[in-house]
Amino acid sequence: MYQALYRKYRPQTFSDVVGQKSVTDTLCSQLETGKLSHASLFTATRGTGKTSCAKILAKAVNCENPNHGDPCGLCPSCRAIDEGSCMDVLEIDAASNNGVDSVRVLRDDAIYTPGTVKMRVYIIDEVHMLSTAAFNALLKIIEEPPAHLLFILATTELQKVPATILSRCQRFAFKRLRPDEIASRLNFIAYQEHIEIEPEAVNLLARLADGGMRDGVSLLDQCASAANGSVTLESVYASLGLAGEKRTAELMQAIAEQNTAKALTILYSGFPKAICLHRSGWINMPVLMISKREASSPPINAPHSVTTGSISVTPMSAKKARVSSGA
């Protein structure tokens, strides 16, 4: 069965993690000095490496031959965790196991010492989805954990995690990745997979990933499959259903020229309903805003506004100024 690229190229060591050096360096230092907290909370938006780092940390604390905090990936413990056969390292999806009964079972099992590895590790993903009663049940075991127990919590919505849980965890804030960091990783994966890809296409995919490495790799996977291994800028537009920056520029030019007919022609011919204007860059153009108004209404008195028929093009800054002044 085909393995998705984001799974195939998931980081296996802290050194493989892209763009989260402050987090990985701290974890490696704690592992080397033996000062790792019994409970860690990873927080960030999707696709930034929270779950990957949690699994790497689970391997690192149980690795028989660690290297400066990184797991070796070759010992029986590392291999069992990678294969998902280690019964002492459990990944729990709080979205589907958010009740108090699930947490009580976890709490009761946590007191037993691990059978095959040094530390029993619970990775609770999307922990903010737990119910209030479940959080209360979890609080006691996090407050007074056995020496063999490690909790790694991950969330995309930190504000929903109770303060009583937050105060008992070490927090690690993962950052959104820069486009150049994502592009570098995409180029590496493309080289490994013998995918020919244009630099412009890589840069576009990196921007569309919106700070998430997993999204970027998934987009590359989708485009490479559709383009039979040769990814161009145009093939990315076609594969992802994007309007394209050139088409968007043509629309902007027509609006600036007050050519309503041309603008509408481009809009309806180049941007069918299935096309995503948001991802093509339209939403990132704050200079112009199209608004419908009655033909008989007075013109908008804003600097540099353009009025043609029933379409008015106004600078976004001017629009905000009118709203704030009550105009």
Report residues per predicted region.
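Low-complexity, glycine/proline/serine-enriched flexible coil segments
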Residues: 287, 305-308
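Extended, largely alpha-helical regulatory/partner-binding modules appended to the mid-to-C-terminal parts
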Residues: 23, 80-87, 105, 118, ...
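P-loop/Walker A NTP-binding region and its immediately flanking N-terminal helices
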Residues: 1-171
